[in-house]
Amino acid sequence: MQKPSLSQDLIWILKSVQSRRSTKGFLQKHSSLKDGSPNKKSFAQPISSSFLNRISITKIDDVDSLSDNTLYGIGRSINSLARLGIQSVIVPTSNPIGMTSPFKYLENGTVVAKKRKLSIFEELQQQQNRVIRVSEIFSKAGVLTRPSYSSVCQLGPEGPSVENVQGIFQALSSLYTVIVPSSILMPNVIEVPIDGNEVLAGLTYSLHKPNFGFWVDRIVILDKNGGMPCSKRQTGSSHVLINLAQEFDELAKTLPPYHRKNLILVRRCLKMLPDDASALITTPEDAMLTNPVLDKNPLIHNVLTDRSIISCSLPRDRSPITKTTVLRSGVPVYTFLGPKCLTDGSVSWERLWVLINDSFKRTLDMDAYLDRLKNSLAAVIIAGDYLGTAIVTYEQPDGTTNEKVPYLDKLAVSQGAQGSAAISDVMFNVMTDLFPKELIWRSRLTNPVNKWYFERSVGSLKSSKTPWKLFWTGDSHVRNLDRVNQYMSVIDKIQPTWLN
């Protein structure tokens, strides 16, 4: 295995950047990083956030089944993340059905291990062998490794935690990648193997210390099964993005047990971290950084853009198969149907007015707008605490009597929430689920967002009468000119309600 050159890796990294906006966002987020030199601040005193060490905690499942070449490719990705200012802690595990059986709690408070095929000593020896193997192969890929051959976690009253946090912090500050076994020290000072999920949770709990300059930026799970399967996408494809605040309960009911376990683990870890932290689940093969493959690397792409490689709101029948899922704590999404919400107090229209003005940088004539909605409102979708909104109306096309077409009247995201939170994507998915047959909207010909709109539509057409461009989407693709003309009549006749 030939060691990659710096220029080769830099080319790979730059290939993952989608746009100038993505590059700018990465630089703004990571401008607080140190300039590549170890942090000389004392670990005993809180330090300024301008010296944050950003950490990725990665669990590699079933390492024994992975080839040296696969681990080498993963090591190259880890090395590239380090060059981007993300230091990693790696937890290699065995097949969860095999040797590393989890402990269990008894009602009397004691902890015992489940029935094992090997003795505890033999299992610990295998854990050490995994750490050694990963460390040696990662080193060949250019990673500066610091292997730990015994447990770094201990079991306390609140669950697993890191025993010697400063030791890991010192290694990370010196730009080492720390590799730890799936084992834990019990209260009686006996080391036993443990499910890697518990080690991942213990590391997350212990290593996120912003006041001391250490920030857990993301959780990564490399699993041969990949991300969470999605029934709405092509067979074999995963969810692209999971907004946990909105989707966890439903997914916990419907996912297969194996994926449900990962879902619960990720939510457990993200609850310990800030809202902008994220998790990524993908296959070991997709996580490899290899020269012959020209596809974008999901780990590097996610660090650079805070997004998945493909957008979750793109038409699903046109999206490629993916085995990568990005998960965020996210925001709850509330849906209000019909004009009742105009008067029943369920929606704060004053806050919506502020949100729309902030998003569009214009002032809405709220009285005129509400007057328009009272006879046409179909749905109001609100993301989080008025971070974003989508307002859909029913409009009557020319030449029809009772037919109504769902029309996206407003899609607004507050300036502070625009970008990596993917609020627009989340709301767009809710809309298309509410109105799967058809949904239309319009945009000025000069609107820079038109590329985003075009990618999510199944058709678009410029108006010959007004400065608008028509977009439409839905399960029933429009195949005749009459229907398009009806859509066009809707967007041409709606009058704007801005004060300026």
From Swiss-Prot:
Keywords, sorted A to Z: Acyltransferase, Amino-acid biosynthesis, Mitochondrion, Transferase, Transit peptide
GO CC annotations, alphabetized: mitochondrial matrix; mitochondrion
UniProt similarity note: Belongs to the acetyltransferase family.
Pfam families (UniProt xref): NAT
Domain N-acetyltransferase: 336-496
Keyword Lipid biosynthesis found: no
A Gene Ontology molecular function term of the record: L-glutamate N-acetyltransferase activity
Coiled coil: none
Protein name: Amino-acid acetyltransferase, mitochondrial
Pathway: Amino-acid biosynthesis; L-arginine biosynthesis; N(2)-acetyl-L-ornithine from L-glutamate: step 1/4
Subcellular location: Mitochondrion
Domain of life of the source: Eukaryota
Organelle transit peptide: 1-19
